[in-house]
Curated annotation (Swiss-Prot):
Broad EC category: transferase
A Pfam family hit: RNA_pol_Rpb2_1
UniProt subunit comment: The RNAP catalytic core consists of 2 alpha, 1 beta, 1 beta' and 1 omega subunit. When a sigma factor is associated with the core the holoenzyme is formed, which can initiate transcription.
Gene Ontology process terms (BP): DNA-templated transcription
Name of this chain's protein: DNA-directed RNA polymerase subunit beta
Gene for this chain: rpoB
PROSITE patterns attached to this UniProt entry: RNA_POL_BETA
Family statement drawn from the similarity comment of this UniProt entry: Belongs to the RNA polymerase beta chain family.
Source organism: Kosmotoga olearia (strain ATCC BAA-1733 / DSM 21960 / TBF 19.5.1)
Length: 1173
């Protein structure tokens, strides 16, 4: 073990692997991508559509004279109008103005002028990689989509079961029509499918590309055949020979001859070694082509045939046909592979290209030749190479691509998603620009600002941020939740998969995920495998492919040189694990090493190892790397552990885990909640709200400003700020006056952080023991001690707001003068009718007094005068005050009032906005959900006095009793090892770091624990021979020892956001739905419990007629009946019989709406009016 500093805490580290690379900034991908969008992305779009030219009619000369040209030169970002906090308070979007410099040229005179135009506001990313949209903090999630390029895949045929799958070469562009080349092994024919329509013979398309002659076509599929093997030659009988066959003195067959049996025998007997023949599939395709279209079809005919198939209704003309096909695949306006797609195609077809040059073009090629096409449209060669490769695949199915390989998927980050939206908007503007330009006749009158419609741009971008599936309300329960949200990869969203159509294979873990995408962290519901998380070291290259770092290994020696590889590049190498044994000089100790190669595990000599992984952590995401002893947990439970850490509510006094993994400090550093020192310096002043640090140089001397004063950095801390999920952000200083801090040191803790480390829960003393059935089936028994110590008490901040508007009957008013309200309810309000800060409020209390005018039509002028004189406001206004909802109590910690002047952006008719923040203290309670880090979750079943809890031989009571049956079947033994090591930490007063896959071993822990317990005198139940970490506990109620020794120790427990108090709900009378007149549902609407169809059957089965009657009528939608019952209960009378439920009336109305004449009669045959029943 060695010691190391994590944040401001020293830990003992068990890990043996020394990582050559620090974990990179965890939100760097988001920040870099947004920076790229501002610096390059915006301009790329503008450049793509410039110059914009217009033709104008000048009065003094000929028509259609040269007009103006607009060119976009550069972009500039202004300063935000409001700061982040103001945007949150006022419900605005945090954005910056975008200015574009436009160069206008008069094409007639050559005059040039440059102008800067305002192009609207762009939502701007905060330093924490979030956006503030309409006052709410949001995150743009990275999207994982199929990369454009060419794919070679097999598709099962719909024909009979014995048929072979069809092989497809699929060209997938970013924009434009698909092109699929198909090889059908059942029909022995090459086909092409243009734009997902009908299939046709491939040679028809090749004819249009200029391969007129049949021999030219077959040349593309030439291959060498062994001329000495007669059997092989006989298989090719009927093929056309593609080059002259000659011996030294005789020409046996010339190019173009058909190979017959006699000729085959003759060739086999001669001394010719190799002859050039077309591949059998090409030959059969040609025959099929001739059968369908005849033998002498020209390229014009081919164009016409294709046009006929694609546009059956139109008259085929040669020019129209040529243009149609050209526009489909060869025009940059209609078709685009993008840079990424071209890069993928070039690398995929490189081998085929090399072979094509050798075989078809018969040229000498260097080994390292590249397929260096640069055009982003389809080229003839792409089609030819793909077809040729497809023909080879028939006998080499192992060369097919896997759709789910990460090499074929790319990540669309924030920058790219915003660029796409900007381009969508700009295309609309571009068309308008062209039209508007033609209006101007004089150069001096052209002003860009008048040409650009800013609204279009802003609406499109705003719509994306407000409504896109990829723009999500930020998960802010704790710092880890926020960090993970920004590192999320989603396969769903526009242009991605749909939840319903996602196959099992797409969701599954793939070997190419290694080091790029976490195989563990993913949701448990419908999105399993579609929403994933980036691995700790993963980064993204310029094309959007995921990269992971490796160390180079040369001749069995590990170097410190690091290379980043994409998933498809990695397939070529032998890669060793990071945990293999290496001596001090970097030489691999074992002579034979286990390596990964192309998704397989194999053993090779150490000299053949090419690369080595950086760290055992590199496989998993940040959340998962926070689970100690992950290697001892089942993957399903680790998944739950990863997900539940994100749901841990920040407790009042955060406590870092005794048993950590070493990643805690890094997660806290990048979460943005820990305040880090920007410069080296000395702490001059500290209080709970701000820290002042005076900068110093290397020698400790103060750094002075130009005026000779020492430079001071002031850090303002956040105090009790509400998050998106109503948890609390509160920062506390962790430095003292006079302390020297280095640049990057933590100087203040945030929520769920302790001494600069992530601290999501508490270290709790636990025992694994069944206790009177109170911990049956994952229930948890808790000691009263945890309540007294406020261990799991959390603070939640609720925000309530109300708006005073102008109504048709007059303005609403915020006032303390509310009609028919007792003095008791007004005691906490100030003279303006707004609750005072510091007041303790509970459900039903008034937070903001508000009255709304209600219309009264029968007021005579005399009444109006009397009212205005005596100020009798009682009858013309109704009380619409903001009240504390049911089940909430707490202290008012802040009130914000905004007047009309401050909130001009809020929309018309709003006079005042009041926001009241109430902090609620929620101690641990029965029904709350607790969990460990290993997916071991449970619900508190009972809280019993400390003196009744089982206790150690030295009298220490345990704090939580867990069921031992929760461990074996779930296979998350990590929790038991954590418990032992945690106890060792508590006894020796140490903190540990046990990195995943490289942590403490069981015997190490037991050895040390036995020593520590012996020293403390609590080694009863543990023998020197068989160290098991168990102890003889006594029952707190009787004082008698339990029958067997019990595992006790310290486990890190989290209180999750599923708090019983927030979920419990009861209703007596409440709101009803407008049409059905049935009670609403759900706690939010103060609704009732649904008594559904099956529940009705249950009561019917029991014969509970009166109960059933009541449930279906007066408790539901019999309006008259429920009022009568209410009166009867108040007056103590018998409950009257039921009336007619509203649902009956609704049914009648619906049937009448279907034009059926339905009427209702009483028993005497008199017609009744449904509306009056």
């Amino acid at each position: 073990m060695r010691k190391a500093m994590f944040g401001k805490r020293e830990r003992w580290v068990f890990g043996k692997v020394i990582e050559p690379l620090e974990i990179p900034n965890l939100i760097e991908i988001q920040l870099k991508s947004f920076k790229w969008f501002l610096e390059e992305g915006l301009l790329d779009v503008l450049k793509k559509y410039s110059p914009i030219k217009s033709q104008i009619q000048r009065p003094d000369s000929r028509k259609n004279e040269k007009g103006f040209s607009l060119e976009f030169v550069r972009t500039r970002i202004g300063n935000p109008k409001y700061n982040i906090q103001e945007c949150k308070d006022k419900g605005l979007t945090y954005s910056v103005p975008l200015y574009v410099t436009v160069r206008i040229t008069d094409l007639y005179s050559g005059e040039i002028k440059e102008e800067e135009a305002f192009f609207g506001y762009l939502p701007y990313m905060t330093d924490n990689a979030s956006f503030i949209i309409n006052g709410a903090e949001r995150v743009i999630v990275n999207q994982l989509v199929r990369s454009p390029g060419v794919y070679f895949v097999d598709e099962p045929t719909k024909a009979s079961s014995g048929s072979l799958p069809i092989l497809v070469a699929h060209f997938l562009p970013v924009k434009g029509a698909w092109l699929e080349i198909l090889l059908n092994p059942n029909k022995k024919v090459l086909q092409v499918r243009i734009d997902r329509r009908r299939k046709m013979n491939l040679f028809l398309l090749l004819k249009t590309l200029g391969y007129e002659d049949d021999l030219e076509l077959l040349d593309l599929f030439v291959h060498d055949v062994d001329a000495n093997d007669e059997y092989v030659l006989l298989e090719h009988v009927g093929s056309i020979i593609l080059s002259d066959v000659k011996t030294r003195n005789e020409l046996i067959a010339e190019r173009g001859a058909v190979l017959t049996e006699a000729l085959a025998k003759k060739i086999a007997e001669s001394d010719v070694d190799v002859i050039k023949l077309p591949m059998p599939i090409a030959m059969s395709t040609l025959k099929a082509f001739h059968r369908t279209y005849g033998e002498n079809i020209k390229s014009e005919d081919a164009y016409i045939e294709i046009f006929r198939k694609l546009r059956p209704g139109e008259i085929p003309r040669i020019n129209a046909a040529k243009n149609y096909l050209h526009n489909l695949y060869f025009s940059p306006d209609r078709f685009d592979f993008s840079e990424v797609g071209r890069h993928k195609i070039n690398s995929r077809l490189r081998k085929v290209y090399k072979e094509y040059l050798k075989e078809v073009k018969k040229t000498e090629v260097p080994e390292d030749i590249e397929y260096a096409e640069e055009s982003t449209v389809l080229t003839e060669l792409d089609i030819v190479l793909a077809a040729r490769h497809l023909a080879q695949l028939e006998s080499h199915p192992e060369l097919l691509d896997t759709k789910d390989h990460l090499g074929n998927k790319r990540v669309r980050t924030v920058g790219e998603l915003m660029q796409n939206e900007f381009e969508k908007a700009f295309v609309k503007i571009h068309k308008l620009l062209e039209e508007k330009l033609t209006i101007y006749t004089s150069f001096d009158k052209v002003t860009v600002q008048n040409l650009v419609n800013v609204r279009t741009l802003m609406t499109t971008l705003h719509q994306f941020f407000a409504t896109s599936q990829l723009s999500q309300f930020m998960d802010q329960v704790n710092p880890l939740a926020e960090l993970t949200h920004k590192r999320r990869l989603s396969a769903i969203g526009p242009g991605g998969l749909k939840r319903e159509h996602a196959r099992f294979e797409v969701r599954d873990v793939h070997h190419s995920h290694y080091g790029r995408m976490c195989p563990i962290e993913t949701p448990e519901g419908a999105n399993i495998g579609l929403m994933t998380s980036l691995s700790t070291y993963a980064t993204i290259d310029k094309y959007g492919f995921l990269l992971t770092p490796y160390r180079k290994v040369k001749n069995g020696k590990v170097t410190d040189e690091i290379v980043y590889l994409a998933a498809d590049e990695e397939e070529l190498y032998n890669i060793a694990q990071s945990t293999i044994e290496v001596d001090d000089n970097g030489n691999i100790v074992e002579s034979v090493v286990e390596v990964r190669h192309a998704g397989e595990i194999k053993y090779v000599e150490k000299e053949k190892v090419d690369l080595m992984a950086i760290s055992p952590k590199q496989i998993v995401s940040v959340s998962t790397s926070l689970i100690p002893f992950l290697e001892h947990d089942d993957a399903n439970r680790a998944l739950m552990g990863s997900n539940m850490q994100r749901q841990a509510v920040p407790v009042i006094k955060p406590e870092a885990p005794i048993v950590g993994t070493g990643v805690e400090a890094i997660a806290a550093r990048d979460s943005g909640y820990v305040v880090l020192a920007k410069h080296r310096g000395i702490v001059k002043k500290v209080d709970s709200r701000k820290i002042i640090i005076e900068r110093i140089d290397e020698d400790g001397n103060p750094i002075l400003s130009e005026s000779g004063e020492p430079i001071q950095d002031v850090y303002t801390l956040h105090k009790f700020i509400r998050t998106n999920q109503d948890t609390t952000i509160n920062q506390r200083p962790i430095v003292s006056q006079g302390e020297t801090v280095e640049k990057g040191d933590p100087i203040a803790d945030g929520p769920s952080t302790d001494m600069g480390e992530l601290a999501l829960g508490k270290n709790i003393f636990v025992a694994f023991l069944p206790w009177e059935g109170y911990n049956f089936e994952d229930a948890i028994l808790v000691s009263q001690e945890l309540l007294e110590e406020e261990t799991f008490t959390t603070i939640h901040i609720e925000m309530y707001e109300t708006v005073a508007r102008d109504t048709q009957l007059g303005p609403e008013e915020i006032t303390a003068d509310i009609p028919n309200v007792s003095k008791e309810l007004l005691k906490n309000l100030d003279e303006n009718g707004i609750v005072r800060v510091g007041a303790y409020v509970s459900s039903g209390d008034i937070l903001v007094g508000k009255v709304t005018p209600k219309g009264e039509s029968d007021t005579t002028p005399e009444e109006k005068i009397i009212r205005s004189v005596f100020g009798d406001r009682g009858r013309d206004v109704k009380d619409t005050s903001l009240r504390v909802p049911h089940g909430v109590e707490g202290r008012v910690i802040d009130v914000k009032v905004f007047d009309k002047e401050e909130i001009s952006e809020l929309g018309s008719g709003v006079n005042k906005l009041v926001k009241v923040y109430v902090a609620c203290r929620k101690p641990l309670d029965v029904g709350d959900k607790l969990a460990g880090r290993h997916g071991n979750k449970g619900v508190v079943s009972n809280i019993i006095p400390k003196e009744d809890m089982p206790f150690l031989p030295d009298g220490t009571p345990v704090q939580i009793v867990l069921s031992p049956l929760g461990v074996p079947s779930r296979m998350n033994v990590g929790q038991v090892l954590e418990t032992h090591l945690g106890w060792l930490g508590q006894l020796t007063n140490r903190y540990f770091a046990t990195p995943i896959f490289d942590g403490a071993k069981e015997d190490e822990i037991m050895e040390e624990l036995y020593k520590a317990r012996k020293a403390a005198g609590i080694d009863v139940g543990d023998s020197k021979k068989e160290k098991n970490g168990k102890v003889l506990l006594r029952d707190g109620r009787s004082g008698l020892p339990f029958d067997y020794p019990v595992v006790v120790g310290v486990m890190y427990m989290l209180k999750l956001v599923h708090i019983a108090k927030d979920k419990i709900h009861a209703r007596s009378t409440g709101p009803y739905s407008l049409i059905h007149q049935q009670p609403l549902g759900g706690k939010a609407h103060f609704g009732g419990q649904r008594f559904g169809e099956m529940e009705v059957w249950a009561l019917e089965a029991h014969g509970a007629a009166h109960t059933l009657n009541e449930v279906l009528t007066v408790k539901s939608d019999d309006i008259k009946g429920r009022n009568e019952v209410y009166k009867a209960i108040l007056k103590g009378l018998n409950v009257p019989g039921p009336g007619i439920p509203e649902s009956f009336k609704v049914l009648i109305k619906e049937l009448q709406g279907l034009a059926l004449d339905i009427r209702v009669y009483d028993q005497n045959g008199n017609e009744l009016d449904v509306d009056k029943l």
